[in-house]
Amino acid sequence: MTSISTTHAVAPQQGELHRTINWQGAFWVASGVPALVLFSIGGIAGTTGNIAFAIWMTSVVLGLIQSFTYAEIAGLFPSKSGGASVYGATAWLRYSKFIAPLSVWCNWLAWTPVLSLGCSIAAAYILSALAPIPAFSEISPEVVAWLADPANLGKTATDAIAALTAAGTPAIRDWTLYSGTLGPVSFSLNAIFWIGVILMLIVFSIQHRGILGTANVQKIIGLIVIIPMLIVGIVPILTGQINWDNYSPFVPLATAYSAEPGEWNIAGWTLVFGGMFIAAWSAYAFETSICFTSEFKNPQRDTVRAILYSGLLCLVLYSLVPFTFQGVLGLEGMLAGPIVDGSGVGHAMAQMVGGAGIVTSIMIMLMILALMLAIMTAMAGSSRTLYQGSVDGWLPKYLSRVNPHGAPTAAMWTDLVFNLFLLAIAAADATSYFFILAVSNCGYIIFNFLNLNAGWIHRIDNGHIRRPWKAPTIFIAAGCFLSFVNAMFMGAGAKVWNPWALWAGVIAAALIIPVFCYRHYVQDGGKFPPHMLDDLGLKEGDLAVRKAGILPYLTLVAGVAVVLIANWIFVI
């Protein structure tokens, strides 16, 4: 048995991450998570209607309950980076070599698209500022003049607005170097793509300095962004701008993206589960704060504090911002195109606090910073997941390379290249954007299922290992129950975003099998690195002892059954 002791800052060995931060540093690196609410706030309103605010509140509460399991298992591994996926993978290793790497892979699949999705939205904000689309109304002088022209006799104001908007739209907004389709999605090398590439390279250069430099930069940006988000969540309540009628009737929509109220029937519940499914991608994401355990000066103290304080921040912001958005904008406003695709969120936030002119410009700039913060959080977390997966023998060896600053640069380059491909898809249209988001979230739900159940598996197989912090057993049990609830969300709700999302997500998750086989059987000769189980005081031969018996296998079968049954029962 290996005792877990307090680890102070020491000189790192060559090729290792550096112990340079405390829980506050991880908190600020994870402070980009609240900005993820802005990725899909309109999309969830479009699928759930007047209950959208409740979807967000419920989802973040579920995430907070689940975090107790993650905090406990993270304490078992003070020398590992990469987050809950890495810690949970070790629990499943006794029962299957192939299930364990699935945890690491699916967590990476969930986190890495934040780079491309965030860059596409931020690029859209920048493009709108540099080359805005003109706005006209029925009483605009240009519209009146267009209708008065004899050549337009019999035309309507709608025709006039469409024609004038098309004529006044800058050519750069329609320009693309190349475009096409890839199965159910499109791709485009347009202006949004190229601006997004620049933003991605900026984030890469900041991350290249190592975790301490990243945490310091994100602390500054985090304060700039979090405070305005709190203002947006509080000011409309204090100034009486909330229209309480915007929360009723408390029923789902009849059909997605239609303002017609529906009923609590199968179709209605399907849309609700679709909202819960996609909200989980944002609301559970503060677990990334424990990706940095091997970079904590004192992992025994810092790990649990990092995830719980990050969770409380998300609880506040994920409750306030959707609540005030809906209360001020109403369902019609939330279903507006610029809100659904994210490009008009900054302008809406400025109006909510009574801003205009320069205030609107400042709010849009803050929105760009919020997205950059989320992108930095994603690159920091996902690259460390790849790094630790490589160190532990799950993923190819090259991913374990770090630079002199202690940054996992090989993993970061992999993130960058993969997301350039995703960015071309996300920049094409909203349908392609939400397809990436839904497929990514299938990976996240699979990761979530495996790691919530890893809590009780570790209790059975590694109960003798001292834990720096031990969660109340009721939270371990609750986490197990919620793993099946989340599986139901995926089975029932993924189809809401794209008919192929669930199956594409399963295929994406299965890609780890050839990757793992290459590393394990080709590069490592069928053996795991000796240090992989050091924290648990085990050797590879000890993995044959399976105290949980068939329970983990029954859990997997039950999880698959829940997904398939939910997919069959709940239809639109």
Segments predicted by a language model, with ranges:
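Membrane-interface "cap" regions at the ends of multi-pass membrane proteins
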Residues: M1-F53, M57, G63-A71, S79, ...
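C-terminal membrane-solvent junction of multi-pass transporters and transport-like membrane proteins
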Residues: E16, L189-A191, V402-H405, N448-P499, ...
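Hydrophobic, membrane-embedded alpha-helices of multi-pass small-molecule transporters
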Residues: I21-F39, S67, F193-I202, V235, ...
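Extracellular loop-to-transmembrane helix junctions
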Residues: L38-W146, R173-G183, F187-A191, L313, ...
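Hydrophobic alpha-helical segments and their helix-loop junctions in multi-pass secondary transporters
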Residues: A124, A129-A131, L223-Y257, T324-L329, ...
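Membrane-interface loop-to-helix entry segments
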Residues: A191-V251, I307-G311, L437-F449, F475, ...
